[in-house]
Amino acid sequence: MGQPLPPVALLLLVSASSRAADVPKALVLLDPPWASVLKDDHVTLKCQGLHPAGDNTTQWLHNGSLLSSQAPAYTITAARAEDGGEYRCQTGLSSLSDPVQLHVHLGWLVLQAPRWVFQEGEPIQLRCHSWKNNKLHKVTYLQNGRGLRYFHQNSDLHIPEATRNHSGSYFCRGLIGHHNMSSETVTITVQGPANPVISSSVLPWHQIAFCLVMGLLLAADTGLYFSVQRDLRSSQRARKEHTLGWSLGSQDK
């Protein structure tokens, strides 16, 4: 029967298992960063995650189905309606990413943003994008049906710090040639305030609990180890004294 692991070895083994279970998630990034695009737009999805040395294999999922591409970047050269949906990725040393939604619209204009939910204090960037980048001018951004900003030449709308007042429905309109075009309406939500960021130096509660339990186990095992060692030494010392006494008694006879 094999000997039980010493306390320190047991602690290291369990700690290594805990780290192996805590695999970082991969991350899907859009390039350009817009969550909504028009038909025929060019879009690249990039997967950020850890790879084994010399192996950049990446698994891509579209609406839950595995894609044939295994490259770190997945390119859509001319977007179609069926390219819209949910994308996720995974690398050799990263777990499956959270889903990223890509919306493909049919029309002349689309109002673009990196996402539709923001925290108070975050910047918001909106873009009025035309199909095949047709020249667009006299552009108006509207919030809840009211004009928010006008540009004679098409420009992005920047909101430096989002507040609750920036929540609402948005669309843009402008001229392509002599034709007045409008985008579909989208909803932007501003939440907040954002939860305070916990310093990475502070361990999550489950890791703290794990360390406390392992510390107690280590202390108990260490105490038991030294107690057994002390008893063994005492027993050996008593046995030596008994043997020595018996030997001296024999000589006296």
Swiss-Prot record:
| Subunit structure, as described in the record | Forms a heterooligomeric complex with ITAM-containing signaling subunits FCER1G. Interacts (via transmembrane domain) with signaling subunits; this interaction is a prerequisite for receptor complex expression on the cell surface and intracellular signal transduction. Binds the Fc region of antigen-complexed IgG.
Give a GO cellular-component term. external side of plasma membrane
Official protein name in the record: Low affinity immunoglobulin gamma Fc region receptor III-A
The source's superkingdom equals: Eukaryota
- Write the record's keywords in alphabetical order, separated by commas: Cell membrane, Disulfide bond, Glycoprotein, IgG-binding protein, Immunoglobulin domain, Membrane, Receptor, Repeat, Signal, Transmembrane, Transmembrane helix
> Which biological process annotations from GO are given for this protein?
antibody-dependent cellular cytotoxicity
Could you read off the lineage of the organism from its UniProt record?
Eukaryota, Metazoa, Chordata, Craniata, Vertebrata
- The UniProt site entry described as Important for receptor turnover is assigned to 221
Q: List all topological domains (Cytoplasmic).
A: 227-253
**Residue positions the entry lists as glycosylated:** 56, 63, 165, 180
Q: Could you list which ranges are Extracellular topological domains?
A: 21-207
The record, for CDD domains, names:
Ig1_FcgammaR_like, Ig2_FcgammaR_like
What topology does it adopt in the membrane?
Single-pass membrane protein
This chain's function reads: Receptor for the invariable Fc fragment of immunoglobulin gamma (IgG). Optimally activated upon binding of clustered antigen-IgG complexes displayed on cell surfaces, triggers lysis of antibody-coated cells, a process known as antibody-dependent cellular cytotoxicity (ADCC). Does not bind free monomeric IgG, thus avoiding inappropriate effector cell activation in the absence of antigenic trigger. Mediates IgG effector functions on natural killer (NK) cells.
Q: Which Pfam families match?
A: Ig_2
- Please tell me where this protein is predominantly located: membrane
Which Cys pairs does UniProt list as disulfide-bonded? 47-89, 128-172
Which organism does this record belong to? Oryctolagus cuniculus
Q: Which PANTHER family match?
A: IMMUNOGLOBULIN FC RECEPTOR, LOW AFFINITY IMMUNOGLOBULIN GAMMA FC REGION RECEPTOR III-A-RELATED
Matching entries from PROSITE patterns are given as: IG_LIKE
Leader sequence range is 1-20
Molecular function GO terms recorded? IgG binding; IgG receptor activity
Which residue ranges does UniProt annotate as crossing the membrane? 208-226
Subcellular location per UniProt equals: Cell membrane
**Residues in Ig-like C2-type domain copies:** 24-90, 99-189
